[in-house]
């Protein structure tokens, strides 16, 4: 039976265990994703406590990490989502995303509403991809694709 979490602590504690086992076994997020049939971003988010994994994927990942059936069952439970504590993020990488939304959030809202109408972009019916590409001017660039279904506001 599908279970649901009503506190973040159990999944966050499991995420700590997963990160420790991942490091001890020298595995990458891609190594853990391989064979699940799911995307790298989804599995990584699930292992960090933000999504439930299907049973077969949870069992496969736990086997790779040397974790027990209790861990697999917890990975299959619906988490209480949201990994950033209240306030402004302090991690530099996470803060840059916060900063991007501070700068471009109103622009994104204006363009979404102009092109789609009154509504939102779903974070549930959603795909995330990140790619590293070479910058012609030197160095690397991160290409991040946020692909969410548009959901119109419905008057009632």
UniProtKB/Swiss-Prot annotation:
UniProt-annotated catalytic positions: 96, 99, 122
Chemical reaction(s) catalysed: cyanate + hydrogencarbonate + 3 H(+) = NH4(+) + 2 CO2
Pfam annotation, one family: Cyanate_lyase
Alphabetically ordered keywords of this record: Lyase
Recorded superkingdom: Bacteria
GO annotation, biological process: cyanate metabolic process
Alphabetized GO MF terms: cyanate hydratase activity; DNA binding
Coiled coil: none
The keyword Lyase appears for this protein: yes
Entry annotated with the keyword Lyase: yes
Annotated EC: 4.2.1.104
SMART domains: Cyanate_lyase
Range of residues in the leader sequence: none
InterPro entries documented for this protein: Cyanase, Cyanate_lyase_C, Cyanate_lyase_C_sf, CYNS_N, Lambda_DNA-bd_dom_sf
Record-stated family: Belongs to the cyanase family.
NCBIfam families with a match to the protein in the record: cynS, PRK02866.1
Entry function: Catalyzes the reaction of cyanate with bicarbonate to produce ammonia and carbon dioxide.
Protein's name in the database: Cyanate hydratase
Source organism: Pseudomonas fluorescens (strain ATCC BAA-477 / NRRL B-23932 / Pf-5)
Encoding gene per record: cynS
């Amino acid at each position: 039976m599908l279970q649901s979490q009503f506190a973040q602590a159990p999944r966050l504690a499991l995420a700590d265990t997963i990160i420790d086992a991942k490091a001890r076994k020298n595995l990458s997020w891609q190594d853990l994703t391989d064979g699940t049939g799911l995307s790298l971003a989804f599995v990584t988010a699930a292992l960090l406590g933000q999504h439930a994994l299907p049973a077969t994927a949870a069992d496969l990942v736990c086997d790779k990490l040397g974790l027990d059936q209790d861990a697999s069952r917890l990975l299959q439970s619906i988490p209480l989502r949201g990994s950033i504590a209240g306030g402004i993020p302090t991690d530099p990488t996470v803060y840059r995303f916060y900063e991007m939304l501070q700068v471009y959030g109103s622009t994104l809202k204006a363009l979404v509403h102009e092109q789609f109408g009154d509504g939102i972009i779903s974070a549930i019916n959603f795909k995330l991809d990140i790619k590293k590409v070479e910058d012609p001017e030197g160095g690397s660039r991160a290409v991040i694709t946020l692909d969410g279904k548009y959901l119109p506001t419905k008057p009632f």
